[in-house]
Amino acid sequence: MVYNNLLERFIKYVKVNTRSNPTSQTTPSTQSQVDFALQVLKPEMEAIGLEDVHYLEHNGYIVGTLPANAQHLTRKIGFISHMDTADFNAEGINPQVIDNYEGGNITLGQSGYLLKPDDFPQLNNYLGQTLVTTDGTTLLGADDKSGIAEIMTAIEFLVANPTIEHCEIRVAFGPDEEIGTGANKFDVEDFNVDFAYTVDGGPLGELQYETFSAAGLDVQFLGRNVHPGTAKGQMINALQLAIDFHNQLPETDRPEKTDGYQGFYHLLDLSGTVEEASSSYIIRDFEDDSFKSRKAFIEQLAQKMNDELGENRVVISLQDQYYNMKKVIEKDMTPVNLAKEVMEDLDIKPIIEPIRGGTDGSKISFMGIPTPNIFAGGENMHGRFEFVSLETMEKAVDVILGIVQKP
């Protein structure tokens, strides 16, 4: 279905810089997210007919309710999207709208960059559709402002069409998903639903209830610096220790060499001097046993290197970040089956695959609200080649509307 305000709403949202900050100690991590919630979303949520719209200062979520209008629809269903965008330039976002995409390269503003089917063959799936792209200097922010726009548009449509019967709907727009902390303080009691969906997926038909289990790893390497001219048998180069550590990780277990259900170790940062160095990794896997094995391997590697050095010069810090929500959701597949049924009713082929990442739904599911993920439309997210199809966004609205009407 065509929704008149969807494109305008989406463009308005993405023009606001809501980039999160991984080094911040506050929640939300940036003031721009607070301003977006209070100055943009809150008045609009109230204007389209949501009730009890309130901002939770302790966690940065803006929440609202659309009461049920049919006694026989007794479920309470939530829809969640995140306000922040990823770690890429988000200042001065200037979206381009390509009507009736005919194929071929898309020039991204005056940046000199091209969005090319040779590089991104999925572009060929969107012939004849309306695409929104960047101008090549920023990301777009479809992750996840497409989700916010879709949820808002669905609510607006229901309020404007009161003869459409629906269950109670609660919506929540939150901070800091991209830096992995947004759902840490999610208020389950305040949200009070039977189950929920994050509208944070990619292409048409995505329906996901499996995520990685995730850990963060920080490693400190303690060296000993002496003059290189007299270093034999005395110098311990901390940077060399970091290199040796990394080279003992399985070469095939890297993001660029894995897919499907394969896990990995991913080096994010390595810096230092001869005297002291540090590296940061993320560790990902799907199954409990293999996730535990990866962490155990790290501990054993550090111990092995320290034994060889004769002292503790490799110091590790491992922190679990989130877990595969399949463990929770498979106990009651109602939200997955409901979304699947709605997609099939709309002639959308459900693509049920694991998320090679995480969503806020991972943590929220373990807090007691099963929260699978449905598509929002974004492609090539987190960079200058990001784009979204308006037609896919419209179908995401259709799915939301279908879910809340199901008995």
Curated annotation (Swiss-Prot):
Pfam families in the record: M20_dimer (PF07687), Peptidase_M20 (PF01546)
Gene Ontology terms: biological process: peptide catabolic process; proteolysis
EC number: 3.4.11.4
Origin: domain of life: Bacteria
Compartment(s): Cytoplasm
Leading EC class: hydrolase
Positions with a binding annotation for Zn(2+) 2: 143, 178, 382
Record has Hydrolase as a keyword: yes
Cofactor note: Binds 2 Zn(2+) ions per subunit.
Molecular function via GO: metallopeptidase activity; tripeptide aminopeptidase activity; zinc ion binding
Binding site for Zn(2+) 1: 82, 143, 200
Iron-sulfur listed as a keyword: no
Reported cofactor(s): Zn(2+)
Active-site residues, record numbering mapped to chain: 84, 177 (proton acceptor)
GO cellular component, one term: cytosol
Keywords: Aminopeptidase, Cytoplasm, Hydrolase, Metal-binding, Metalloprotease, Protease, Zinc
Reactions listed under catalytic activity: Release of the N-terminal residue from a tripeptide
Matching NCBIfam families: peptidase-T, PRK05469.1, PRK13381.1
HAMAP family with a match to the protein in the record: Aminopeptidase_M20
Function: Cleaves the N-terminal amino acid of tripeptides.
Family, as annotated: Belongs to the peptidase M20B family.
Protein's recorded name: Peptidase T
